[in-house]
Amino acid sequence: MTMPFKGVSADDRRTDRRNRLVVAAFEIAGTEGAGALGVGRVCLAAGLTKRYFYESFASLAELQSAVVDHAIAAMSERVDPYRPTGPGGPPQAWLEAFVGALVDDECLARVLLAETHGGALSPFRHQIIDVAIAGMAPPGSDPQADLRARLGAYAQIGTLTELCLAWHRGQLAMERATLVDVLADLFVRIDGARSAAPGTSSC
């Protein structure tokens, strides 16, 4: 049995080391791009030796997946309190929280939008689409079974990616509140167009 060190159990120490690696990797991906992730680079940023990397991750791909999970968890913490619980139109409060999180946090925007769109994290793009679908879906529905919901989510995330990243690069001269309003309105319009469209076959 492994004895606690300074009152901290071995399991807690392992969890802490893993969290440090994930946070360090998230910050690197969010500032330099996911292509800058490497075992040595991440361990140096986390203040750990390489052997502790392999204690938590079998490969760099596993770490990349954990970075996306970390980013989605950070997003969920912002938006889940605004998830609608009853029927109605598009959830405006959820939309504003979702868009606002990406406008306020450039690292989060880069990881979830830029790096999953043609970047090193592109294999995880579908997870971002799933978040958008779930947030816009009426309570009790099965959005994953609705092809039009997925098509609409791709259009919404594509629009959000271009405008949000352009704003972070200083290419859009508008206030933060205006950008959030514009993006939320575009989400609603795309959702309305999807809902009004004729039935779409999944074949």
Go through each PLM region and give its residues:
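Hydrophobic alpha-helical connector segments
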Residues: 77-106
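Amphipathic alpha-helical segments used for helix-helix packing
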Residues: 99-123, 137, 165
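Helix-turn-helix
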Residues: 28-62, 66
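Short, amphipathic alpha-helix enriched in basic
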Residues: 8, 14-41
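Short hydrophobic clusters on alpha-helical segments that form packing/core surfaces
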Residues: 17, 21-29, 71, 75, ...
